[in-house]
UniProtKB/Swiss-Prot annotation:
Residues 48-57 have a biased composition (Basic residues). GO terms for biological process: translation. InterPro entries: Ribosomal_bS21, Ribosomal_bS21_sf. This is Small ribosomal subunit protein bS21. GO terms for molecular function: structural constituent of ribosome. The keyword Phosphoprotein does not apply.
Length: 65
């Protein structure tokens, strides 16, 4: 669980900014979305392979541009 203590003379905005940064780095939202519903292992592997291919194509296009 992500928690942040407010420091002396620190504004709420700065504290919120620190919280958001910790929240993103911890991957809470990403993990929640990944576990929102069950995906069969075969489908999960297929999706990962297709994402990997797209990422490789984009990287290759950027190198050739």
């Amino acid at each position: 669980m992500v928690s942040v203590q407010i420091n002396d003379n620190e504004s709420i905005d700065k504290m919120l900014k620190r919280f958001k940064k910790k929240y993103e780095r911890a991957g809470v939202l990403k993990e929640f979305r990944a576990n929102a519903y069950f995906v069969k292992p075969s489908v999960d592997g297929r999706l990962k392979r297709s994402r990997s291919r797209r990422r490789a194509q984009r990287a290759n296009e950027e190198r050739n541009s």
